[in-house]
């Protein structure tokens, strides 16, 4: 599990405003962390995400050269055990996408 990989996973159970259902997620935590914890920090990818788009928390995958479409929701980080949730690696994003995602994620933790 490496930063920049897209996995397809079941996010349920969820509560309230959390993204739900089976969907792609982007791994944003570094590989050494993922190796030790077996539970990477991920961001959901959605075709909706109106709030994230208008609030500046969405990074579009349009033009990134990925089969996965939609936007990465930088406002919804989660730690998931991908194996326990039946996750499957789909593909990886280019470095430019992960750089933009990390730049939009950073202010949340300041």
Task: Kindly give the residue locations of the regions a language model identified.
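Conserved functional hotspots at enzyme active or ligand-binding sites that engage polyanionic ligands
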Residues: 1-110
């Amino acid at each position: 599990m490496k930063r920049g990989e897209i996995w397809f996973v079941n996010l349920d159970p969820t509560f309230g405003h959390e993204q739900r259902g089976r969907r792609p997620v982007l791994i944003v935590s570094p590989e050494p962390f993922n190796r030790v914890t077996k539970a990477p920090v991920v961001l959901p990818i959605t075709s909706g995400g109106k709030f994230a788009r208008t609030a500046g928390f969405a990074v579009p995958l349009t033009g990134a050269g990925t089969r996965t479409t939609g936007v990465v929701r930088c406002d919804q980080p989660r730690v998931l055990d991908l194996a326990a949730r039946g996750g499957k690696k789909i593909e990886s994003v280019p470095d430019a996408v992960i750089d933009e995602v990390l730049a939009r994620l950073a202010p949340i933790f300041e």
